Every structure is written in structure tokens, then in C-alpha cells.
Amino acid sequence: MRGAGGFFAALPSCPPPRAPEVAPAGRAQIRAAREGDLAQIAAIWNHEVLCTDATTDTEARDPIAQREWFARHTERYPVVVATLASADPDRDGPVVAYGSLSPYRPKPAFARTAEDSVYVARDHRGRGLGGLILVELIRRARMLEHHSIVARITARNAASLRLHARHGFREVGVERESAFKLGRWHDVAIMQRRLDAP
């Protein structure tokens, strides 16, 4: 990873989640991601890469790679974050979840289908933040005139499967043992929501 220096040596291990010390999703704010959020987004992402099968990616992102990832998310493929309320009204609280839309496939025929990603910091799960992020991604996808959203979810990720089902996604296929990570093969469920459906 270019220019990372000691970045990867400093990556944390995989501790168990702690009980949240902050209020639940009712106090969270959803907004477009900014460059100043990238370190916190990377911290959430890198934990999932290194410690879980929630993503099939296997390489953590250094700061350069994280900026390049953000630059690829043009207006048509937004990134949104959930931040917690801050005691200072002029400053955001910490980023505790994020989500993004990405191109589903590079071929032009797929230009109006997006793929979503939703990640919640490990110490803030089970508090509705993933739902807030997904609702905002659906809203923005409609505004951008996408026709459908696809999610590819490892079959053991029950929380993400339930989240997407609650928000109108339906399973349309399963890739059997298509991903190998953390010493085992994983099935990958494909879920889809058409945006012209209720």
C-alpha cells in the first residue's frame, strides 16, 4: 500500500464490541460524507475487512486508498454517514455508520442499477443506524433515477440480510461458495429492490 508507512502495523486487533456509551439512532444525524470523515470511515471499514466476513474484501485501506475510494464516488454514487449529536452545536459528533452506492457493473446497460454497502461501527450496532443509512441511500437513489439497488451479502451476515429485507429487498439468487475469507468458503446472497416498487 503506497505511502502507508507504519499504517498497517498500527491497525488494531479485533476486540469484542463494547456497550455503546451514547444515545441510539434517535440522536443520529444523516448527511453526505465529507473528506474530513474519511479516517473514521476507514476505521469502520478496516475492522470489517480484517475481523469479519461482512465484506469479501481482504485488504485494509490506507489513507491514500481511502481518498481514492471517495473520489470514485461521484454525485451519482453518493456516500452518506451517520454522526452522533455533539455537545458543540458547531461541530459534528463521531461518525458511527456509513453507506454508499456504487456502480453495479461497468457495462453501460447496468448504469441505472446501483450496489449498496452499509457498515455500522462495531460498538454501535443494534440501535437502528443501519436502517437510517439504508433509507437515505434508497431516497438518494430515487432522486438520481436509479431503477434498482442490489446488495451482495455473505450468507452468514444475518443482520444485513434482515436489514435489507425490512426495507423492501428480496433475495434473487445465491452464489454458492463464491468467496473464500477467514479460512472458509462463503455463500453470497444477492438481494434487490426495484425503486419503482412500493
Ranges and model annotations:
Residues 100-103, 108, 150-153, 165, ...:
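Conserved catalytic-core motifs of GNAT/GCN5-like acyltransferases
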Residues 29-43:
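A short beta-loop-alpha structural element at the N-terminal edge
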Residues 141-153:
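Conserved GNAT acetyl-CoA-binding A-motif
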Residues 116, 149-151, 191:
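A structural signal for short, well-ordered beta-strand segments
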Residues 8, 59-125, 134-135, 140, ...:
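Acetyl-CoA-dependent GNAT
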Residues 126-141, 158, 162-166:
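Conserved acetyl-CoA-binding loop-helix of GNAT-fold acetyltransferases
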Residues 42-69:
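Conserved GNAT-fold acetyl-CoA-binding loop/helix
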Residues 1-24, 193-195:
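Acyl-donor-binding surface of acyltransferase catalytic domains
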